[in-house]
Design a protein with these regions (language model features):
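Transmembrane helical cores of multi-pass ion-transport proteins
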Residues: 1-138
Length: 138
């Protein structure tokens, strides 16, 4: 519902336009699409650590499609990046229900998730940035 609301109100398009304008200012022309793909992934990964992964995917998918449209790029790799990043909720017990469950039952501390989750998130980001553009061209 949130994703549809963002799409119907134009909020997704507005966020996409502003994001692309900001990246246009920072990144040279050739690398804009990959920089935006990385940005979409990183924002999604950050949100999924503090919100439900399903909610983040629903929220970010219309924005990712809008970003791709603004760039004149294929939207599929951007949506794939959202799905990969939304599923990479490793650094906190909040983003995924199983993490919350083992957090309580297993007696883990918040820092335990950070110690293991941050390196795992970095690894997933690097792999995603190498694989996504190869399998789903921008």
């Amino acid at each position: 519902a949130m994703g549809l609301a963002m799409e119907h109100t134009g909020a997704a398009a507005l966020v996409a336009q502003k994001t692309v304008a900001f990246v246009n200012y920072l990144v040279p022309g050739v690398h804009k699409a990959i920089a935006m793909l990385a940005g979409v992934y990183l924002i999604t990964a950050l949100f999924t650590e503090i919100l439900s992964n399903n909610a983040v995917a629903a929220l970010m998918a219309p924005i990712a499609i809008g970003v791709a449209a603004e760039l004149g790029a294929n939207p599929r790799p951007f949506v794939i990046a959202v799905m990969f990043a939304a599923s990479a909720a490793f650094s906190t017990p909040i983003g995924y229900q199983t993490n919350t469950y083992v957090y309580g039952i297993g007696g883990y501390k918040f820092g335990d998730f950070l110690k293991i989750g941050i390196p795992l998130n970095i690894l997933c980001f690097v792999v995603a940035m190498l694989v996504i553009p190869e399998v789903w061209p921008l």
